[in-house]
Structures are given as C-alpha cells and as structure tokens.
Amino acid sequence: MDYWIRYPVGDLRGHTYYDARWMSKISFRESNSSVDREKWQIPEMDITMWLGKQHSFCVLIPVINEGKRITNLLQRMKLLQVSELADIIIIDGGSTDGSLELESLNEFNIRGLLVKKGFGKLSAQLRCGYAFALDHGYTGIVTIDGNNKDDPEAIRRFIKKLEEGFDFIQGSRFIHGGKGENTPILREFSIRFIHAPCLSFASGFKWTDSTQGFRAYSRKMLIDPKIAL
C-alpha cells in the first residue's frame, strides 16, 4: 500500500506544528512477511524488566546517567498520563548513577527496562529498542531523549498522527513556533545552515532540524526492506 508522507515538525515546549507541504510519495510494505530479522544489526542487550505489552504504541527513552533529568521527565509523563496511551520502555546505555533502580521506576508505570551490553552509544540503544518493539508487535514507536529537554505533552499528538497513517513524525526547534533551549550557538548554526540543507538536498525532503531525536515511526516503515535497522 502507498502512503503520502508529510514532514511533520514541532515546537518542543508546548505546541506541535506541521509543514503543509507534501513530500515525495514513498511505498512502505504493511506485510510482516518482508521482515528479515537476521539482517538486523542489534547490539547485545539484557531485558532487566518487562511487564508485558498493554498498548499498540510504545515510547522508547534512551538514557545514560541522566540523574534527576530522567526522573523529572518520567514525573511529567506520569502527570500527562502517557502510560494510558502507550507502553513506556527505557533503554539504558549503561548508567552508573543509580537513576534507574527498579524500585524507583515502579511509580512511573514503566513497562520495560532494557540494558544495552554491546558496543555503540545512542544509535545502538535505539536499535535495541526498535528491535524489541517490533518483536513485540507494536504498530508505532515514539522516541524521546531522557534528558528532559523535550515536551512529553507532544507525545499524544505524535501518536494521533501515527493513527492517521503518518509513517514518520519529527520535532523541530527551527521552524516558526519552534523553540530550542540551551542549544550551543555553533551547534545550532551547523544544524540550520549545514547539516539540514545538505540532508534536504540529498534526500529530496525538506528538513529543518535533522538531529532532533523527538520522533515517531510506524511499524510498516521500520520493517520495510528499504530501511536498515
């Protein structure tokens, strides 16, 4: 089945906006028969906690030594009742600060805690999370960093767009209505005027914030043969 992909963008502190321009038409397969798990490059990981699947969507949170930041993020998500919409799964990159003790996570309705054991950093953590989510049949995945810089209120809107048939949603700090906090000037310049324009030119899609990790993916996108997990 073919899907029209629109590039969605968002304000990370309260309001999500969507670019009205339609992008290229991309065909993603819905059938699970195309999944070839043997080709996935998944780092070794331990499943430290898994309470089972409750929802069709999950929120993946990559974390490493975030201390109070991850606690504050989980508290915000609890107040927003995110766990009523999606299963919350944390992917730990090897924290040593005690911020992810199981006893302290219970109050935040966390469904799973994965610990990456193999090589790699953030991208390796995310691959662990993607593989786990796909193995457990989730139809959509939202990723949000564990540093409490992104606004979890937008998770509800990301999920709504997945339900409407969108395959990829990404937040942006650099569009009208967007806002970034504590982004170094050199980093912002590099993203806005070097990385995003180069990626836009190479891909044929309009990117405004190519490094923002607050995203959502449909299952059919992640299992498509054109996507390398």
Question: What do the PLM-derived regions correspond to, one by one?
Answer:
Residues 138-149:
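Short beta-strand-to-loop acidic/aromatic patch adjacent to the donor-nucleotide binding site
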Residues 2-76:
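N-proximal low-complexity "stem/linker" segments adjacent to membrane-targeting elements
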Residues 112, 116-135, 152-229:
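Acceptor/aglycone-binding surface of glycosyltransferases and processive sugar-polymer synthases
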Residues 78, 82, 104, 134-135, ...:
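Residue-level signal for alpha-helix termini/capping positions
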Residues 55-58, 78-89, 110-111:
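Short loop->beta transition adjacent to catalytic acidic/histidine clusters or analogous donor-positioning motifs
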Residues 92-101, 148:
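A conserved acidic beta->alpha catalytic loop
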Residues 66-69, 95, 122, 151:
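Donor nucleotide-sugar binding loop of glycosyltransferases
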Residues 61, 85-95, 144:
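Short beta-strand/loop segment that forms part of the nucleotide-sugar
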